[in-house]
Amino acid sequence: MKLNNLPSEFQEALPILEKIKAAGFEAYFVGGSVRDAILGRPIHDVDIATSSYPQETKQIFSRTIDVGIEHGTVLVLEGKKEYEITTFRTEEEYVDFRRPSQVSFVRSLEEDLKRRDFTVNAFALDEEAQIVDLFDGMTDLENRTLRAVGIPAERFNEDALRIMRGFRFAATLDFEIEPTTFEAMVQTAPLLEKISVERSFIEFDKLLMADFWRKGLRAMIDSKAYNFLPDLAGKSDELEAMLTSLTEEFRFSTSEQAWALLFVCLGIDNIKSFLKKWKTSNDFQRSVVKLVEIYQLRQAGPVTKQICFKYGKEFLYLVEELHQAQGFVTDFAAIDKIDQALTIHDKHEIVVNGGHLMKAFDLKPGPVLGELLKEVEFQIVEGQLENEEQAIMTFVKGILENE
C-alpha cells in the first residue's frame, strides 16, 4: 500500500533516507509517526531506522552526535533539522522488565519490527511512500484496534511500561484494546511496580490529557493496573467517580486540572506527599494544591476578592470549568468582574513593604510586622485602603496607636 499524501515532515527528511540508500543500506520511517501519517494526525517526531550500523551511519553524514550509540542511535544534523537514526536491532532478555540485557544490531527490517509494542506502531515507510506492514496493522487501524505484536505477554514482560502506553494509546487514538492483548495486560500489570515512577507518570498524564481519556482510564480500571501504581491501590471506586462526575464531552485544559480532579475524587489530604511519590516537580505540586484548595472554597461559597487575589483568575477559571462539567452553578463573569476590580494582583505591587514600616515606626522583624503587612494587603484587596504610601502609613499608625 502507498501513502498518498506524504506529510511535509517526511518530505523534509527524504534526503536522509536517500543518502543512506545511496550508500548501499536500507532506511525507513518507522513508529508512531507512520501510524499518525496514515490516520491523518499531526506528526511530532520523525524516527528513521536503517540497516547501517552506527559507525556506518556516521560515515554517511558529516555532522552527527552520539546520543545513544550503544543502542544504535545516532543524531544526524542536516541543515537546521535533527534526526535520530537507529540501526535495526533485536533485544535480548529484559532483566528488569524495562531495559534489554543486550542489544544486537541486525540488517533485517523484519527482525527490528518484531520488537515493537503494538501492530499500529510497527509500520515502516520507504522513500517511495510504500507502507511496510508485516503484522496486519492496517487491519487493526481500520478496526480501531490496539493489538500487541506477536505474543502479548512477551511484549509486556519485555517492557512493562507498554501496559501504560496501551492505555494511553486507547485514550489518544480512541481504539479498543484487543481481548488477548488486554488479558496479557491484566496478567502482567504487577510488573508496573518495577517501572520508574517518572515513566508511569508521563504515560498517565498523557492519558488524562487525551481527547478520549475516559477510554484509557476505563481500561486501566478494568485491568486493575491502578493497584500497582503509587498510592492508587484499592481506589477503583474513586477512579470510577472521576469517570462519572463529569459531562461526557469534557476535556481537561491542563495536566494540573486533571490531577486536581483526581485528588478531589480520591479525597486525599496530603497532595504534595502523593505527588512526590510520582516524582513530580515542585511547581506542579504547588499548582495542583492550589486548584484543589480553590475547588473546596468554591464548594463552600462564591468567589471573593481575597480568593481571586490569592489564586489568580487563570486558576479560578480551571476550577470553574470543572464545576461546570460537574453540573454545579458557575459564574465566569463574576470572576472577571472581581479580577478587573482588584487594584493589585500581587503583594509586591504594594508601594510600602516591611522595610518601610520598620523604619517609620521603629519596628523589628516578627509577628507584629507580619500581621501589619497582612492587614494592609487585606484592606487594599478589599478596596478599603488606597495603595498609596501616605494612606498606608496613616492606616498602620492608627492600628499601632490603638494597641
Swiss-Prot record:
Swiss-Prot/TrEMBL keywords: ATP-binding, Magnesium, Metal-binding, Nucleotide-binding, Nucleotidyltransferase, RNA repair, RNA-binding, Transferase, tRNA processing
Gene Ontology annotations of biological process type: RNA repair; tRNA 3'-terminal CCA addition
Positions that bind CTP: 32, 35, 116, 159, 162, 165, 168
Catalytic activity: a tRNA precursor + 2 CTP + ATP = a tRNA with a 3' CCA end + 3 diphosphate; a tRNA with a 3' CCA end + 2 CTP + ATP = a tRNA with a 3' CCACCA end + 3 diphosphate
Miscellaneous information on this protein: A single active site specifically recognizes both ATP and CTP and is responsible for their addition.
Similarity section: Belongs to the tRNA nucleotidyltransferase/poly(A) polymerase family. Bacterial CCA-adding enzyme type 3 subfamily.
Function of the protein: Catalyzes the addition and repair of the essential 3'-terminal CCA sequence in tRNAs without using a nucleic acid template. Adds these three nucleotides in the order of C, C, and A to the tRNA nucleotide-73, using CTP and ATP as substrates and producing inorganic pyrophosphate. tRNA 3'-terminal CCA addition is required both for tRNA processing and repair. Also involved in tRNA surveillance by mediating tandem CCA addition to generate a CCACCA at the 3' terminus of unstable tRNAs. While stable tRNAs receive only 3'-terminal CCA, unstable tRNAs are marked with CCACCA and rapidly degraded.
Subunit structure: Homodimer.
Name by which UniProt lists this protein: CCA-adding enzyme
Organism: Streptococcus suis (strain 05ZYH33)
